[in-house]
């Protein structure tokens, strides 16, 4: 199944894929966690030096996420590859198949850490599972249908 609303008649993949929906899901989960931290989940709030540690790690993750996003979107010119139905396997895409999703997930982890609530750490594996299941059942299937063995070989690296 393809998202036809985002394609022209010659393009086989949507430009943005399921990405915007997944990013909204991560943001909604983190906002819900923030709201619950103000009430039901107050028992998980950190005090003292751990808050500073969470802030530092969160900031570093958000910085790294921004860099990965820039490399995977701006520097790689992924939009052109998608429009031309080319499989992108160079640059950051030589290291990971889904750097854009990975960057958003890292940014989400960074924001969770900035909330200073240990209960919210449970969101990290939940978000990873959601991203993994959705990507495998949408974009990875679409890419295999479009590129066949070339995509299978790319995944095997």
PLM features per residue range, with description:
Residues 1-90, 105-157:
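Membrane-anchoring alpha-helices and their flanking helix-loop junctions
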Residues 92-106:
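Membrane-interface loop-to-helix entry segments
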